[in-house]
A protein has these predicted regions:
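Catalytic cores of phosphodiester-bond hydrolases, prominently lipid phosphodiesterases
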Residues: 1-241
Length: 241
């Protein structure tokens, strides 16, 4: 973890207007608990408030620039529940929906598509459909950019962060390994973004057209970055408002 964070910090030093979202969960056997993990992260890693955003809420991009934004998929120690004026420590995604087509964390902060158990090749089409549906849900959101909003207005208009996983696998079927799935999912999502994204049958966009966070697999393979270009391009349209 230390080596990974060193690379993240180096990236942020070189690109101070960017942000990096880090999602962490505890896995594996042993006697360690979520609470142990939370204390280790707080004490030894997420120590610099100028570099880490660890409030239990979704930040604005301005707040997040040049910082690591921590999403925790684990419970926290009782001592950390008092952090941030009693709101808790880090963005709460403890109740992360498992293997879901459309799920919302109990905190309401994150809406996720993470259907990953592709048991056979015919299920890859289901994965593509679920990913496209999540893109459509994200596209419908509208960000209020009026400058005279109060904090209460911002909170009332808040919507969850959309997280959309394109990755999936089945270890026991070689034709459902991550690279094979990506070879079908990625071109399909590129096609969706180019021809259908935020374009309903009426021809009028329904929202801002943002894609949300799209977690990709095998991007840049053999120099093909079209998927990333499409995602960045769709989100960049917000700059024209």
């Amino acid at each position: 973890l230390r080596g990974l964070l060193d690379k993240i910090h180096a990236f942020l030093d070189a690109n101070p207007t960017e942000t990096v979202i880090v999602s962490i969960k505890r896995e594996g056997i042993g006697n360690a608990t979520d609470q142990h993990l939370s204390k280790i992260l707080k004490t030894h890693y997420a120590t610099d408030r100028d570099r880490w955003f660890t409030d239990n809420r979704i930040p604005t991009l301005g707040e997040a620039r040049n910082k690591v934004v921590l999403i925790r998929r684990f419970a926290i120690d009782e001592s950390l529940e008092k952090e941030n004026d009693g709101a808790g420590w880090a963005i709460d995604a403890e109740s992360w929906p498992d293997n879901c087509a459309d799920g919302i964390c109990s905190s309401g902060e994150i809406r996720v598509q993470d259907f990953y158990e592709v048991t056979a090749t015919h299920n890859i089409s289901k994965k593509i459909t679920f990913a496209a549906e999540q893109l459509a849900r994200s596209a419908k959101t509208v960000c209020d950019l009026s400058k005279d909003q109060t904090a209460a207005d911002v909170e009332a208009a808040k919507f969850p962060v959309f997280v959309n996983f394109l990755s999936a696998s089945n270890f026991w079927r070689a034709n459902c390994w991550p690279d094979k799935i990506a070879a079908k999912v990625n071109p399909s999502i590129i096609d969706h973004l180019c021809r259908k994204h935020n374009e309903p049958s009426t021809g009028k966009p329904t929202g801002d057209g943002s894609t949300g966070i799209v977690v990709c697999d095998w991007v840049g393979h053999e120099g093909d970055w079209d998927l990333v270009r499409c995602i960045v391009g769709m989100n960049a349209k917000l700059e024209t408002r």
